[in-house]
Curated annotation (Swiss-Prot):
<keyword id="KW-0689">Ribosomal protein</keyword>
<dbReference type="GO" id="GO:0006412">
    <property type="term" value="P:translation"/>
</dbReference>
<comment type="similarity">
    <text>Belongs to the bacterial ribosomal protein bL34 family.</text>
</comment>
<protein>
    <recommendedName>
        <fullName>Large ribosomal subunit protein bL34</fullName>
    </recommendedName>
</protein>
<dbReference type="GO" id="GO:1990904">
    <property type="term" value="C:ribonucleoprotein complex"/>
</dbReference>
<feature type="compositionally biased region" description="Basic residues">
    <location>
        <begin position="10"/>
        <end position="19"/>
    </location>
</feature>
<dbReference type="Pfam" id="PF00468">
    <property type="entry name" value="Ribosomal_L34"/>
</dbReference>
<keyword id="KW-0687">Ribonucleoprotein</keyword>
<feature type="region of interest" description="Disordered">
    <location>
        <begin position="1"/>
        <end position="44"/>
    </location>
</feature>
<dbReference type="InterPro" id="IPR020939">
    <property type="entry name" value="Ribosomal_bL34_CS"/>
</dbReference>
<dbReference type="InterPro" id="IPR000271">
    <property type="entry name" value="Ribosomal_bL34"/>
</dbReference>
<feature type="compositionally biased region" description="Basic residues">
    <location>
        <begin position="26"/>
        <end position="44"/>
    </location>
</feature>
<dbReference type="GO" id="GO:0003735">
    <property type="term" value="F:structural constituent of ribosome"/>
</dbReference>
<dbReference type="GO" id="GO:0005840">
    <property type="term" value="C:ribosome"/>
</dbReference>
Amino acid sequence: MKRTYQPSKLVRKRRHGFRARMSTKGGRKVLTARRARGRKRLSA
């Protein structure tokens, strides 16, 4: 059986990166919440 996590830097950036977050309303909400919480890293 193939494992579910097959790492790819490109896919990671595209799906969970900063620009991907900024491109949707919900994503911007995520960044706002992470900033409010004081997260060092906002996105992948």
